[in-house]
Amino acid sequence: MDNLKILLRLYRQYTKMDLLWFLRDTRYCLLQIVSDTICACCTIAGVFLLSEKFGGFGGMNQAEILFMMGFSTLVDGIYMMFFIGNNTAMISRIIGRGQLDHVMIQPVPIWAELLAQGFSPLSGSSMLICGIGLTTYAVSRLPISVTMPWLMLLLIYALSATALIISFMTLLSCAAFYAPAAAEEIAQVGKDLFTSLKTYPLGTMSHSVRRLFLTVLPVGMAAWFPSALLLKAGCGEFGLPMLLQACYLPTAAFALSLLTIYVFKKGMKYYAVNGSPRYSGFGHR
């Protein structure tokens, strides 16, 4: 309970800091918000135009693809709001640049600081708003029964997909403990993998490709897989096989999170002994 109070206090402080940025430098804050909105539109534009041209593809029609893109933007919005500030999601930069000590000297648990320092409820909310709006519009075009259990499933899948992306990026970032200069930007590579591929439907791809994108490279679990399950659940297709599939994403996200925590702790032990090679007599980079 004490740790939860610490986390909530940190969220409150970072909310104040984000609001102060907006009040003191409104022009640049609005520029970032508008830029994020444009990026959200550009991310989904390619797939949307393909679906308009061919009337849908990958085993989905236009409305279903629009829903998948809305879900994808919703996941990106959660990611942006909670992890975009202070390079939190790009933690390989923090590790690689020798800036992890900035987090470690804070008088709070390191996990709480890492969870809270990226929170940007004002400047980072534009993509989340776009995701909510696009998902709502897509649902209005589909024969889906929107109930409270369905909305809860949507929320669980969105949070699970976000946790999966963050865990995957952090797992890659652990390489920066051992090769700081070479792996400084590896988190961006992981993010680009999801950004470029997660909005494509995988329904008509071969089983081997789908297994690859649902296991080793889990880009399919960030948008296509949960969207397909939500569409089936909204149409009342919820038998025992569907129930087993429905548990896959939260279970995979939880398992990957545990693996990431284990590997990150191993990296922290290495860091405690060796420190950062990027320190010098003039300080660190």
Locations of regions flagged by a protein language model:
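Hydrophobic transmembrane alpha-helices and immediately adjacent juxtamembrane helices
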Residues: 2-285
